[in-house]
């Protein structure tokens, strides 16, 4: 069972607290998430989520 309902609801959970919205993925992939550490306005395209944040190298 796919825990990601992206195709149906456009939202999924990657990791414990990272929730991505406007998700177009058909399966739950961490790279689909756009969760960022506090202070980051956004993550670079294709950023891989690590828990509920991404590395500083992902931030733009």
Curated annotation (Swiss-Prot):
Superkingdom of the organism of origin: Eukaryota
Binding sites annotated in the UniProt record for a divalent metal cation 7: 49, 54, 58-59
Gene Ontology molecular function, alphabetical: metal ion binding
Binding site for a divalent metal cation 1: 4, 6, 20, 23
Swiss-Prot/TrEMBL GO biological process terms: angiogenesis; positive regulation of cell migration involved in sprouting angiogenesis; positive regulation of vascular endothelial growth factor production; response to cadmium ion; response to copper ion; response to metal ion; response to methylmercury; response to zinc ion
Binding locations of a divalent metal cation 2: 6, 12, 14, 25
Region (Alpha): 29-60
Start and end residues of each stretch annotated as Beta: 1-28
Keywords per UniProt: Metal-binding, Metal-thiolate cluster
Residues binding a divalent metal cation 4, per UniProt: 32-33, 43, 47
Residues that, per the record, bind a divalent metal cation 3: 14, 18, 23, 28
InterPro entries in UniProt: Metalthion_dom_sf, Metalthion_dom_sf_vert, Metalthion_vert, Metalthion_vert_metal_BS
Ligand binding (a divalent metal cation 6): 36, 40, 43, 59
Residues reported in the UniProt entry to bind a divalent metal cation 5: 33, 35-36, 49
Keyword Endoplasmic reticulum attached: no
Family: Belongs to the metallothionein superfamily. Type 1 family.
Entry note about domains: Class I metallothioneins contain 2 metal-binding domains: four divalent ions are chelated within cluster A of the alpha domain and are coordinated via cysteinyl thiolate bridges to 11 cysteine ligands. Cluster B, the corresponding region within the beta domain, can ligate three divalent ions to 9 cysteines.
Primary role: Metallothioneins have a high content of cysteine residues that bind various heavy metals.
Protein's name according to its UniProt entry: Metallothionein-1
Organism: Danio rerio (Zebrafish)
